[in-house]
Amino acid sequence: MASIRRPHSPAKQQHLLRHGHLGPFASSSPPSSPLRHSSSSSSPRSAAHHHHHLLAAAGHTSFRRPLPRFAAFFLLGSFLGLLHFLSHLPRPLGPIPNPNSHHRHRDPFPILQHPHPPSTPHSNHKLLIVVTPTRARPSQAYYLTRMAHTLRLLHDSPLLWIVVQAGNPTPEAAAALRRTAVLHRYVGCCHNINASAPDFRPHQINAALDIVDNHRLDGVLYFADEEGVYSLHLFHHLRQIRRFATWPVPEISQHTNEVVLQGPVCKQGQVVGWHTTHDGNKLRRFHLAMSGFAFNSTMLWDPKLRSHLAWNSIRHPEMVKESLQGSAFVEQLVEDESQMEGIPADCSQIMNWHVPFGSESVVYPKGWRVATDLDVIIPLK
């Protein structure tokens, strides 16, 4: 018995088609008369076209609803990813403490405070390049530590301390420099020269000049002997140097314990003469000590600032007599006293001393630790 399938009403068919409940073979045409139904079934081309139209409408309806969900989940995932990224960003640091504040941390071993002269507006932008030759000896740790304590007080100015070891760098000197907390560079030179020879010092100075020249360091270059005693006023005056400056330096003789004063005689900042004690030093062109002058480091690598354009490079003379080496080096920087400035204006202040101290023997305990001669001489009762 043939079953008779009743079609849905037109309103119900539209409702089912809108919500995708009709299958691909459901018809959306309204009921018609048998004559019209037979005519539609007899035309297969129109039926196929009508079936394709129904599939397109159903697919368009089924793909329309997931788009808002996809957009919502995409935005949610992006937001969660940004939260994970923001959680790994560096947190802002707290306010930088004011060094002049009364609530700063107090050092349990305070350093004696010295009155500082008023600094110039450009003092914070001038690099001080301090060159110190050193060699292995029992008093090396004492010299380097004392020099470092002086340089640590120059916290208001950029500083680079170049320490040049005669021979290979030693672990003892490197450890002593690391404890100073001063920005430094520790290098060795003249490995083939005996450290007790009198001609190793020019090689050390030239090694430091090579560093300044190769890296094009711009600042005030000063040769500070490790045996010297320095005032803070000296380093504050060094920041104001424009080209070349000099000042008098007293030196205590090791043999006679006499004070030898060498340096310029100035009038309103202009060098008008020289003061010297030894008669043999009168043969020199400039009567100054190696720790009694400073100059702009750009004179080493900028030919436009040199007084003698014929010099290819400015280096410390190595084949000149020791007493004439300082004057021969300065002759490469300036032509005469008119290109010098005396500091202070009248050159009447002593701002550093050259005081030799300690044994000159190159033998010293390894690690500065004594392992022998530690027997008990006076026992406890």
Curated annotation (Swiss-Prot):
Residues 91-381 are lumenal. Glycans are attached at N194, N296. It is a single-pass type II membrane protein. Its EC number is 2.4.-.-. It is found in: Golgi apparatus membrane. Residues 21-50, 96-122 are annotated as: Disordered. Keywords: Cell wall biogenesis/degradation, Glycoprotein, Glycosyltransferase, Golgi apparatus, Membrane, Signal-anchor, Transferase, Transmembrane, Transmembrane helix. One of its GO terms (molecular function) is xylosyltransferase activity. Residues 1-69 are cytoplasmic. Residues 26-46 have a biased composition (Low complexity). GO terms for cellular component: Golgi membrane. Gene3D superfamilies: Spore Coat Polysaccharide Biosynthesis Protein SpsA, Chain A (3.90.550.10). It is an enzyme of class 2 (transferase). The chain crosses the membrane at residues 70-90. Its main location: Golgi. InterPro entries: Glyco_trans_43, Nucleotide-diphossugar_trans. Belongs to the glycosyltransferase 43 family. Involved in the synthesis of glucuronoxylan hemicellulose in secondary cell walls. This is Probable glucuronosyltransferase Os04g0103100. The lineage of its organism: Eukaryota, Viridiplantae, Streptophyta, Embryophyta, Tracheophyta.
